[in-house]
Amino acid sequence: MAPSQLPPMFNPTPQDIEMLLAAQCHLGSKNLQVHMEPYLWKTRPDGVNVINIGKTWEKILLAARIIAAIDNPADICVISARPYGQRAVLKFASHTGATAIAGRFTPGNFTNYITRSFKEPRLIIVTDPRTDAQAIKEASYVNIPVIALCDTDSPTDFVDVAIPTNNKGRHAIGLVWWLLAREVLRLRGTLANRETEWDVVVDLYFYRDPEAEENKEIAEETKVPGAEEIGAGAVESGFAGENWDTQAPGAGVPGSAFAAASAAAATSWEADGGDWAASSAPPAGESWAETQPTEAKW
């Protein structure tokens, strides 16, 4: 990383540099656009261009100062047509008060005042100049400044501030938006000083696949407990001891009580010794009709 030209108080912390490297913000593509050469550190033997992380940090601070200079946060429009950046722009908008356009950008948002979605922002921030080309083109028609996350192969036409970073990985995109939001809050005074940690974790800015999350929940609900889990549950509830050959205290009590009751009933019936048929049969020489009570005649 090249030496920074920033004042010492704005220098990145070792944790910030580790996060940028872990999210692979320094890995560009194999193609290089001529206007992105100043942000290039070197090219690896496999052809991948490596971005200078120091330049990335400097541009994040510059973009944050521009954003903090706008009085009304709602006049800032953050845009991402790329799925990996949609969650990040929504979180950025909720934390800074900006207006988010996540998904398809409707043509005419900045130029056609008849449409309901017409907007007049003072600044727009896009995730990828290639996928958000329509927004940049319309911004150029109405003189709106543009901040963009630019990879080594990104076109920089009509881009006023380019933040050199990997804009194709979900972790890299989420981390840059998170760092940008944190610096904006620091400059606005929401965070007391630069030593104050932001309580929002960077994971909230990462893209999550809805189908993968849904399948994960379904798999957890339909998961069949294994033998180890069943055994552990039985030991905790007291129905089985740690040694399966030896019953725990109280184990099998319902079965023992039922067996004892059955044995007692069988003993009492055998002791009676009487003939059930004899007790219900009429005496000899009498008919069934004679044994029935006679009804009173009126």
From Swiss-Prot:
Gene3D superfamilies noted in UniProt: Glucose-6-phosphate isomerase like protein, domain 1 (3.40.50.10490)
| Keyword Ribosomal protein assigned | yes
Q: What does this protein do?
A: Required for the assembly and/or stability of the 40S ribosomal subunit. Required for the processing of the 20S rRNA-precursor to mature 18S rRNA in a late step of the maturation of 40S ribosomal subunits.
User: Compositional bias (Polar residues) at which positions?
Assistant: 289-298
Q: Which organism is it from?
A: Aspergillus clavatus (strain ATCC 1007 / CBS 513.65 / DSM 816 / NCTC 3887 / NRRL 1 / QM 1276 / 107)
Highest rank taxon of the organism: Eukaryota
Give the protein's recorded name: Small ribosomal subunit protein uS2
Quaternary form? Component of the small ribosomal subunit. Mature ribosomes consist of a small (40S) and a large (60S) subunit. The 40S subunit contains about 33 different proteins and 1 molecule of RNA (18S). The 60S subunit contains about 49 different proteins and 3 molecules of RNA (25S, 5.8S and 5S). Interacts with rps21.
Q: Where in the cell is it found?
A: Cytoplasm
Lineage, uppermost ranks: Eukaryota, Fungi, Dikarya, Ascomycota, Pezizomycotina
GO molecular function, a single term: structural constituent of ribosome
What InterPro entries is this protein classified in? Ribosomal_uS2, Ribosomal_uS2_C, Ribosomal_uS2_CS, Ribosomal_uS2_euk, Ribosomal_uS2_euk/arc, Ribosomal_uS2_flav_dom_sf
CDD domains per UniProt: RPS2
